[in-house]
């Protein structure tokens, strides 16, 4: 009896501490719950250094709502994980939250039942300052090289960890940006090499959401840069938007555009529901791979790929994404229940958006007429691009050859001469108009023109013959003129 009375004050004190902690909405990190192991290694973060992050939404326009929603969601996860605002650099056009079509002005959601993810996100680089050049300068920590924006850069030191997340449209060897030129694989990899040579980070993890995103790293990503990369798709397939109107699950009825991207929501929803001090990068990779493949069916799904230094994936995710104390007692990573969700090819998401805008507009209204015109011009410009590339191939190689669609063996880069690729893209756009986000799918064709030794002069002649009658004036609504991609 005496022994029981002796322990009662201690139990009472513990209960008071737990009630106090719970009343604050979370448990204090210093108070270990019975289900949490007291692992000194997990508690001691002195050797981690500073966590840095670069978040890039590479698109603009309300039809691309999902990319900025993805990036804002990622920002909220990192902030909950303890990363400081001063250590997170955000590049996004910032034309969605307050867009006239946004049914909830000043907010963005990334899930049908999700909360606002826009509030508090810093406007480091917006509008015309969202450029490939600024992205490279930010990553290199070169404050003198950035133009416009907040001037914030990744001023990392040798013991620091860096997380890079990009979401947008892409194509073979290229990642889109709202202001051209785009991010080309060779330039991106060269930037990573420079960052490594500067000795200003310990390790880096990169997540890329884009069509053909594997082609950015295939055959050219070194393994000795202390960088681990995963991509939403391999080098020759699309990635997918999700949480789209008319699909399951569907966004709230007032939304006419997709809220997220399949690979992106897969990693973020995984991070939010697991203790990142216990979950490894490898575990998240396999979870995201399973979900992004639509559970190994690849029916509306893509192949998540990995590149670079694979030894990094044995590390815990908190080294890059931080640790949210609210997740302290969540279970170790388990594969989610196999529940396929509706998706749309990234390149068709804008058509889906235009269709729903047309469908929901009042009959006989100016808005309905304008939307139909934009939808018509968009599809017409797509047909023009496809037909032009096909005709150029016929002129250069003959009608029976399929040279421009050839895919190289795994492990080989898209093209041997990246400057040649840029040159061929520029020639095409000068004669045939902007590739737009849809036309980036033809980058492999231009790469194969280079790989087959075609000169710039021959490409000029073929493009002139194929597009001699092209007129920009035919496209008064569709944004076919967006500057040169290269």
UniProtKB/Swiss-Prot annotation:
It is found in: Vacuole; Protein storage vacuole. Disruption phenotype: No macroscopic phenotype, probably due to functional redundancy. Slight differences in polypeptide accumulation in seeds with an increased amount of propolypeptide forms of legumin-type globulins. In plants lacking all vacuolar-processing enzyme isozymes (e.g. alpha, beta, gamma and delta) shift of storage protein accumulation from normally processed polypeptides to a finite number of prominent alternatively processed polypeptides cleaved at sites other than the conserved Asn residues targeted by VPE. Glycans are attached at residue 309. Disulfide bonds join 244-258, 420-450, 432-467. One of its GO terms (molecular function) is cysteine-type endopeptidase activity. PANTHER family: HEMOGLOBINASE FAMILY MEMBER, LEGUMAIN. GO terms for biological process: proteolysis involved in protein catabolic process; vacuolar protein processing. The lineage of its organism: Eukaryota, Viridiplantae, Streptophyta, Embryophyta, Tracheophyta. This is Vacuolar-processing enzyme beta-isozyme. It holds the Pfam family Peptidase_C13. GO terms for cellular component: protein storage vacuole. Belongs to the peptidase C13 family. Asparagine-specific endopeptidase involved in the processing of vacuolar seed protein precursors into the mature forms. Probably involved in post-translational proteolysis of seed storage proteins in the protein storage vacuole of developing seeds. Its EC number is 3.4.22.34. It comes from Arabidopsis thaliana.
